[in-house]
């Protein structure tokens, strides 16, 4: 390898920069490079440190030569190999789709046809390896890479699967190999984990576990540690994986044959290569694969299964909507579109286009529109089988009420299209608006008479963005459409998507008409929910899931997904269409009261635009004429909050797209405190009350989103028409975000996401115990969130944000860069390795950490003693001491060194004991070599070495002192480390109490904590029971004082 210019390094005919880091593991680092002449040829350069390799370098070279000869489309190609003094460089094929582990993390599960596509390619690579006698022995999703020739949004059928990282594990040192096993024990065969003799069938077991995870989302046999998994395999002679019932027979038989504990009973390679499931002509259960999700750094994709909750995806943005719209000219065309979607499975279109839609099963009736018009639910609900057809089949004629006996004479035509509606039987009556909505009703009438709205018929087939899109069917209204509103009917048949009119996924908060059948909830609230059956599963006639139009949710979660079912709100006659959604059944969260199922918040991808609960949905891209009754300025950083407010019954209409600096022009508060903030729901008489489960959003969240914005200057409504006042609360300090104070181009106001649940009961509106994640530019107050520690600034008023400790970053994309539909990504923090470790490992690590903290405090005391000794050696001090008759005081410098030596000896003893404990626990297998353990042990070792060096230096410095001053040795025996530590702790408590008495409380709490830590350490080292009891009493007093002090600060 030769260093190039600008930090570019060369490996043979290839070059790379260490800035382009792709990934790293326990033994190697991978960089992205390219060919020096053919720049379009991208490669991956893996750098392996020779310290991680065993002595058999010649065998590694032979193995690499063999791998260079393996030319297969499903094996990562090895282009070049260079061995340097300290490292080995492997130049391999670059795969732009990431690995299968990331793919499954995004999609959770794959359909059987996608599993077969991937498995056929894996089998092709294994056929070549098996013919050459090569055993992989480490097959796992992380070692299966994906390549997308067609780009990031390639169809799953176009994804190329490639096996990587085989043959190298055998040359790793034994202890390093043990660390690797901690990462992937679930995919290793039982004979490998139990250290028995194994052959090539071990790879077949790994393939079985990978297929099982692709199908169900988890490994077939799991344990908290490799030791537990080994014990599980040793105790259970027969293993039977839990295969879902709806799995096809060929795939079930394949899994059972691959996942045999005894390798003799396991199928061989010939049976595997010729298995019926791998045969493309074998009829299996079809499920359309979901398009490939967009990764930040790769373009791999997946397919979604109908058996589990899919990963969160984003709805289409406003920029994508014009490409997704389909124009309908009549109700018959609208119904025909539904029929066409159902029958389009046999079309000869491109696979990318057909796979973007889900084919409605043939058993669904074709006269959906006719039955919807008669105010009856369809006999069989449109349940999407795991993918995302979006059809809003609800019909409603705004401003018209049905006659006492509404009937609709329509019969489906032979082509499946319904006949025309006899809408002349229905009498039309003009609804009387409430007094506060007179102006809005006049605007509504103007919109109804607008020629552009009467002549424009819209319908859009929603394409899935990422993996899926929020799906739902609008429910039918008892009001049939009039014969003059054919265009409006086509609009109401629009298959809703990312427009403001499309409802977002939420269960149990939509008021219902009396004509709809309902599912009783445990609390008595009426909830219409349903779950999509697997393809081929039958739905009984009496099943509750057939009573509502349902679908699987693949969209981003709203902040109110965990709301308790609220009482039904009275709906005016002009209320827009509602929609019911069927959330996926997940096993992780406990069901909320009143909900059939609820989904945990998994971050926040792009949220759909907020609901516009005006009587008419606006035309996409046209200005809105209807005036809002509650006029909230729409900022890019508050889209998700507007969704929540609209869902809770607040009528909102965006006047126009405005940014925060525009709003600041109409804001009379330029950093001043304003009135009472948000009024309670009972004062406003509006449906803005908090439900019992709104722990994900507090009143502080609403203040942060809307508090810094005054009423929109472009609105013609007066303040008297707005019964709700949005202003920053005086209890929160009344201060604005720095970006909101300036009149220039500044960042939008921060949106505060509360993480975790508040205490039981109602959360105070002025609560400051929240964690702030700023949505917006980098100038937001708190853009870094910590998953472990939260620190509140003591003594600060409400304007001081909560400072999160350094940790994992919850990065939220800038909404300005993505317009109003910008992707809001939540990067979940990685779980610490100790999460799945055994209790003995956790307890030992806690003990090591405590030893390290205690030793550091003792070293601070030793440093203070050393500084006092240095000061005593100064000329001024010696001049003053020359007149003192006491000889011991003349030797104060040496005395300080003696105290320092005793403390360093104590530290060395503690650290030596901790290191020995770690070694014993590691040898016993109770302490795993995780990165945290390595870091703590490394720090313990460093401090131990430093303490030993300090002891040696001090002993040399005091050697003459001990020889000349023999009489002082008797006094030195009375100096013990425990006595010095106790004395220092008492002094710290006394000084803190003295400062507290004089109202200097800034540094009291840290000193109390340090003293408490020192006393805790003494309690572990002392042997005299009386001393231990005295220390316990001192600790109790300090803890009481700390409790009183903290309650006074945070009150």
Curated annotation (Swiss-Prot):
Location in or out of the cell: Cytoplasm, Cytosol; Preautophagosomal structure
Q: Which residues carry this modification: Phosphoserine?
A: 317, 403, 450, 467, 477, 479, 521, 555, 637-638, 757, 774, 777
Matching entries from PANTHER family are given as:
SERINE/THREONINE-PROTEIN KINASE UNC-51-RELATED, SERINE_THREONINE-PROTEIN KINASE ULK1
GO MF entry, a single one: Hsp90 protein binding
Specify the species.
Mus musculus
Query: Bias regions of kind Polar residues — which residues?
Result: 437-459
User: Where do the record's region annotations for C-terminal domain lie?
Assistant: 829-1051
Name of the protein in its database record: Serine/threonine-protein kinase ULK1
Residues that bear N6-acetyllysine: 162, 606
Among the GO biological process terms of this entry, one is: neuron projection development
Task: Give the record's family classification.
Answer: Belongs to the protein kinase superfamily. Ser/Thr protein kinase family. APG1/unc-51/ULK1 subfamily.
Q: Where does ATP bind?
A: 22-30, 46
């Amino acid at each position: 390898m030769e260093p190039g210019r600008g930090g570019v390094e060369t490996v043979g005919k290839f070059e790379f920069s260490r800035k382009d880091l792709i990934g790293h593991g326990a033994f190697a680092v991978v960089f992205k490079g390219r060919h020096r002449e053919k720049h379009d040829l991208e490669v991956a350069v893996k750098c392996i440190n020779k310290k991680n390799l065993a002595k058999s370098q010649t065998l590694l070279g032979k193995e690499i030569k063999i791998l260079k000869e393996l030319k297969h489309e499903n094996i990562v190609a090895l282009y070049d190999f260079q061995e340097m003094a300290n490292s080995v460089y492997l130049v391999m094929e670059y795969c732009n789709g990431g690995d299968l582990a990331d793919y499954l993390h995004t999609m959770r599960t794959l359909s059987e046809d996608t599993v077969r596509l991937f498995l056929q390619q894996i089998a092709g690579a294994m056929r070549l390896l098996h013919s050459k006698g090569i055993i992989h022995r480490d097959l796992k999703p992380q070692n299966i890479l994906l390549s997308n020739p067609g780009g990031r949004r390639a169809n799953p059928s176009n994804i190329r699967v490639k096996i990587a990282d085989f043959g190298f594990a055998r040359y790793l040192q034994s202890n390093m190999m043990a660390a690797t096993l901690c990462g992937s024990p679930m995919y290793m065969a039982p004979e490998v984990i139990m250290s028995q003799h194994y052959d090539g069938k071990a790879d077949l077991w790994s393939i079985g576990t990978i297929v099982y995870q692709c199908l169900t989302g988890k490994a077939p046999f799991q344990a908290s540690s490799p030791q537990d998994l080994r014990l599980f395999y040793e105790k259970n002679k027969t293993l039977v994986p839990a295969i879902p019932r709806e799995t096809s027979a060929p795939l079930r038989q394949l899994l059972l044959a691959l996942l045999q504990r005894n390798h003799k009973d396991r199928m061989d390679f010939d049976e595997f290569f010729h298995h019926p499931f791998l045969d493309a002509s074998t009829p299996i259960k079809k499920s359309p694969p979901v398009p490939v999700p967009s990764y930040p750094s790769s373009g791999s994709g997946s397919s979604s299964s109908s058996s589990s909750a899919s990963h969160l995806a984003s709805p289409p943005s406003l920029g994508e909507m014009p490409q997704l719209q389909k124009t309908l000219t009549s109700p018959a065309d609208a119904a025909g579109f539904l029929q066409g979607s159902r029958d389009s499975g046999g079309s000869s279109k491109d696979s990318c286009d057909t796979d973007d839609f889900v084919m409605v099963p043939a058993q669904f009736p074709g006269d959906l529109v006719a039955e919807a018009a008669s105010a009856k639910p369809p006999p069989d609900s449109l349940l999407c089988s795991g993918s995302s057809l979006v059809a809003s089949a609800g019909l409603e004629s705004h401003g018209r009420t049905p006659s006492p006996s509404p009937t609709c004479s329509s019969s489906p035509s032979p082509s499946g299209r319904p006949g025309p509606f006899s809408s002349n039987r229905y009498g039309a009556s003009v609804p009387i608006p409430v007094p506060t909505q007179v102006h809005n009703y006049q605007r509504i009438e103007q919109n109804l008479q607008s020629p552009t709205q009467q002549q424009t018929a819209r319908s859009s087939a929603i394409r899935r963005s990422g993996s899926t899109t929020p799906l739902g069917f609008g429910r039918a209204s008892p009001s049939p459409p009039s014969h003059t509103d054919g265009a409006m009917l086509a609009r109401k048949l629009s298959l809703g998507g990312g427009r403001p009119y499309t409802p977002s996924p939420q269960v149990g908060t939509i008021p219902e008409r009396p004509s709809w059948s309902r599912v009783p909830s445990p609390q008595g609230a009426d909830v219409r929910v349903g779950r999509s059956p697997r393809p081929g599963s039958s739905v009984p006639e009496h099943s509750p899931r057939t009573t509502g139009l349902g679908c699987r949710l693949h969209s981003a979660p709203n902040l109110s997904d965990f709301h308790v079912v609220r009482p039904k709100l009275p709906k005016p006659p002009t209320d827009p269409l509602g929609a019911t959604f069927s959330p996926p059944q997940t096993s992780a969260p406990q069901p909320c009261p009143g909900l059939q199922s609820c989904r945990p918040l998994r971050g926040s991808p792009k949220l759909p635009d907020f609901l516009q609960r005006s009587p008419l949905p606006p035309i996409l891209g046209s200005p809105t004429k209807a005036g809002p009754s509650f006029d909230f300025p729409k900022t890019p950083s508050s889209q998700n909050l507007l969704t929540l407010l609209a869902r809770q019954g607040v009528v909102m209409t965006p006047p126009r797209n405005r940014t925060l600096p525009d709003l600041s022009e109409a804001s009379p508060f330029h950093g001043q405190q304003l009135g009472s903030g948000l009024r309670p729901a009972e004062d406003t008489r509006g449906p803005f009350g908090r439900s019992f489960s709104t722990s994900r959003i507090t009143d502080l969240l609403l203040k942060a989103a809307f508090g810094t914005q005054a009423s929109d200057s472009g609105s013609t409504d007066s303040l008297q028409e707005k019964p709700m006042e949005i202003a920053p609360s005086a209890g929160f300090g009344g201060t604005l975000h720095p970006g909101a104070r300036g009149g220039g181009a500044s960042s939008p106001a921060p949106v505060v996401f509360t993480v975790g649940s508040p205490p039981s009961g109602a959360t105070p509106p002025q609560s400051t115990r929240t964690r702030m994640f700023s949505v917006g530019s980098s100038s937001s107050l708190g853009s870094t969130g910590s998953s472990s520690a939260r620190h509140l600034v003591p003594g600060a008023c409400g304007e001081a944000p909560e400072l999160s400790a350094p940790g994992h970053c919850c990065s939220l994309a800038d909404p300005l860069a993505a317009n109003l539909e910008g992707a809001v990504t939540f990067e979940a923090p990685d779980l610490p390795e100790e999460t799945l470790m055994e209790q003995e490992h956790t307890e030992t690590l806690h003990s090591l950490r405590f030893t390290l903290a205690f030793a550091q405090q003792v070293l601070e005391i030793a440093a203070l003693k050393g500084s006092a000794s240095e000061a005593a050696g100064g000329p001024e001090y010696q001049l003053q001491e020359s007149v003192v008759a006491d000889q011991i005081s003349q030797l104060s410098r040496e005395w300080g060194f003696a105290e320092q030596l005793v403390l360093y000896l104590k530290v060395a003893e503690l650290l030596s004991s901790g290191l020995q404990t770690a070694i014993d626990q590691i040898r016993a297998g109770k302490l795993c070599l995780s990165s945290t353990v390595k870091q703590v042990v490394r720090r313990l070792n460093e401090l131990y070495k430093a303490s030993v060096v300090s002891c040696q230096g001090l002993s040399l410095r005091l050697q003459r002192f001990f020889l000349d001053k023999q009489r002082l040795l008797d006094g030195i025996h009375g100096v013990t480390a425990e006595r010095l530590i106790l004395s220092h702790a008492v002094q710290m408590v006394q000084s803190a109490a003295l400062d507290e008495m004089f109202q200097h409380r800034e540094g009291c709490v840290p000193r109390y904590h340090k003293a408490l830590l020192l006393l805790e350490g003494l309690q572990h080292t002392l042997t005299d029971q009386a001393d231990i009891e005295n220390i316990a009493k001192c600790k109790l007093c300090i803890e009481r004082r700390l409790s009183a002090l903290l309650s006074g600060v945070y009150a």
